[in-house]
UniProtKB/Swiss-Prot annotation:
GO terms for MF: DNA binding
Record's keyword annotation contains Repressor: yes
Coiled coil: none
Known function: Antitoxin component of a type II toxin-antitoxin (TA) system. Functions as an mRNA interferase antitoxin preventing effects of the HicA 2 toxin.
Lineage of the organism: Bacteria, Pseudomonadati, Pseudomonadota, Gammaproteobacteria, Enterobacterales
Organism encoding this protein: Photorhabdus laumondii subsp. laumondii (strain DSM 15139 / CIP 105565 / TT01) (Photorhabdus luminescens subsp. laumondii)
UniProt KW keywords: DNA-binding, Repressor, Stress response, Toxin-antitoxin system, Transcription, Transcription regulation
Subunit structure: Probably forms a complex with the probable mRNA interferase HicA2 (its cognate toxin); when complexed with HicA inhibits the toxin activity.
Protein name as catalogued: Antitoxin HicB 2
UniProt DNA-binding residue ranges: 96-113
């Protein structure tokens, strides 16, 4: 996944207002009376849609690079997306990752939950255990 996790949006307008859709994440839909209002609500819609992927243990698609506008994924969420996708790509269960980290499966369940705050070092350690390295870049 790219260093910047920014998902492109598509706008549609009719007499009822503006709709925002994410071509890469079709579950993420929102709208507003104005284009600006719809875009302001888009990040919440995107993160809410990610919850469905986490619950179903489905890989979250990589963002495409072309769009009218983009919505940035918060760093704390982006790190968890990277962890979930890595677990799925390596077919690593919560129990297996817990064994690799010397912790309980319940702790891994919290780590891969979007509703639970997790220290970035914890996510980095989990990715390291799966053979990946979490890299943060300021641009």
């Amino acid at each position: 996944m790219s260093k910047n996790m920014r998902y492109p949006v598509k706008f549609e307008h009719d007499e009822t207002g503006w709709a925002v859709m994410f071509p890469d994440i079709p579950e993420a839909l929102t709208g507003g009376d104005t284009r600006e209002e719809a875009l302001a609500m888009a990040q919440d819609a995107l993160v809410t849609a990610f919850d469905f992927y986490f619950e179903d243990r489905r890989e979250i698609p990589t963002p495409s690079t072309k769009g009218e506008a983009f919505v940035e994924v918060p760093a704390s969420i982006a790190a968890k997306v990277l962890l979930l996708n890595t677990m799925l790509q390596t077919r690593t269960s919560n129990a297996e990752l817990a064994r690799l980290l010397g912790t309980r499966p319940q702790e891994i369940q919290r780590i891969v939950s979007l509703s639970h705050s997790t220290k970035i070092d914890t996510i980095a350690n989990a990715l390291n255990a799966l053979g990946k390295h979490l890299e943060l870049v300021a641009i």
